[in-house]
From Swiss-Prot:
An example molecular function term from Gene Ontology annotations: small ribosomal subunit rRNA binding
CDD domains attached to this UniProt entry: bS6 (cd00473)
UniProt xrefs under HAMAP family: Ribosomal_bS6
Record keyword rRNA-binding present: yes
Protein family: Belongs to the bacterial ribosomal protein bS6 family.
UniProt-listed NCBIfam families: S6 (TIGR00166)
GO-annotated cellular components: cytoplasm; ribonucleoprotein complex; ribosome
Protein name, UniProt field: Small ribosomal subunit protein bS6
Segment forming the signal sequence: none
Length: 109
């Protein structure tokens, strides 16, 4: 099965508890469709370059997912319907990167 990098921005008004619930809900959607969540990273509450839906900040999160293309299409369709997710980007990757991403490394410095 192919590997996908799924990055999304959640609303700034979500508490940490609500954000964890959103991530758990997304991961349960994946497992229902036969996909596997390999890695999850929280990048933090970051400023936007421009306002999105009258919001200036958002919670940036990234997931690495192993899934078939049909189940990934279904997952993306359901994420579009979720009002807590403002934007997302899904990319196909060749392999899982080692270590933390640059965003996590920058936030730890």
């Amino acid at each position: 099965m192919p590997l996908y990098e799924f990055t999304f921005i959640a609303q700034q008004g979500l508490t940490q508890y609500e954000l964890e619930g959103l991530v758990k809900g997304l991961s349960s959607l994946l497992t229902k469709n036969g996909a596997e969540l390999l890695k999850y990273e929280y990048w933090g509450l970051l400023d936007f370059a421009y306002a999105i839906d009258k919001m200036n900040k958002g919670h940036y999160c990234m997931m690495y997912i192993r899934s078939s293309s049909t189940s990934m299409d279904e997952f993306k369709r359901k994420v579009r319907l979720n009002e807590d997710v403002l934007r997302f980007l899904c990319l196909k990757r060749d392999k899982l990167p080692e270590g933390d991403s640059l965003m996590v490394q920058a936030s730890q410095a």
